[in-house]
Amino acid sequence: MNEIVQLFLLIWPPYVANGSAVLAARLRRRHPLDFGKNFLDGRRIFGDGKTFEGVAIGVSAGTLLGYAPNLAYSYLTLLDAFLLATAAIVGDLLGAFVKRRLCMPRGYPAFPLDQLDFLLMALLVYSLYRELHIPLLLAAVVLTPVIHRATNYAAYKLRLKKEPW
C-alpha cells in the first residue's frame, strides 16, 4: 500500500476525533469533564471547554468516520480507529491540563500542545501494539501543525470556534 495512503488512514481517526469534539460547543447544555472542580493549584482541571459531550462526539466520530476509509483500503480495524480516536481525545485533555497548570486561558494558542498533543498520544498508543514506521511518524508530526492551523481557521470561519488557532 502506498505510504501516503497509509499515513492518511493512520492519522484520520485522531484528526476526526480532535476536530469533531468542538461540535459540542453548539449544544445548549454541556457538562464539563472536571465538574467545575479545581486542581491542587486552585485552577480548573480542564476548564469549561472539555465536556462529556465533546468526548462522546469526538470518540464516536473519530471511530466511525475515522474507520470509513478502511472499508476501501483495509489498513486499520474498527478497534484501531476506536483506540486512535480515544487516545487523541486523551491527548487533547492532557494538553488542556498542562495549559491550565501554566496559567494559559482557554483558547490561548500554545504550540506544540494544541497542534500535536492529540496526535502524539494516538500514535503512542498505536505503537504499543502495532509497529509504527518512523517515516510515517515524522511525516505526521511535520504535517499536523499546518493541517491543524488550516482546519482551525476553517472552523473559525464556520463559527465553530471563537479563535482562528
Swiss-Prot record:
GO terms, biological process: glycerophospholipid biosynthetic process
Top-level taxonomic group: Archaea
GO CC terms: plasma membrane
Cofactor: Mg(2+)
Pathway annotation: Membrane lipid metabolism; glycerophospholipid metabolism
Primary location group: membrane
Alphabetical keyword list: Cell membrane, Lipid biosynthesis, Lipid metabolism, Magnesium, Membrane, Phospholipid biosynthesis, Phospholipid metabolism, Transferase, Transmembrane, Transmembrane helix
Keyword Nucleotide-binding among UniProt keywords: no
Record EC number: 2.7.7.67
Keyword Repressor among UniProt keywords: no
Catalytic activity: 2,3-bis-O-(geranylgeranyl)-sn-glycerol 1-phosphate + CTP + H(+) = CDP-2,3-bis-O-(geranylgeranyl)-sn-glycerol + diphosphate
InterPro entries recorded: CarS, CarS_archaea
Membrane-traversing stretches: 4-24, 78-98, 118-138
Subcellular location: Cell membrane
Membrane association type: Multi-pass membrane protein
Gene Ontology MF terms: CDP-2,3-bis-(O-geranylgeranyl)-sn-glycerol synthase activity
Function: Catalyzes the formation of CDP-2,3-bis-(O-geranylgeranyl)-sn-glycerol (CDP-archaeol) from 2,3-bis-(O-geranylgeranyl)-sn-glycerol 1-phosphate (DGGGP) and CTP. This reaction is the third ether-bond-formation step in the biosynthesis of archaeal membrane lipids.
Family: Belongs to the CDP-archaeol synthase family.
Protein name: CDP-archaeol synthase
Naturally occurring in which organism (per UniProt): Pyrobaculum calidifontis (strain DSM 21063 / JCM 11548 / VA1)
Gene name of the encoded protein: carS
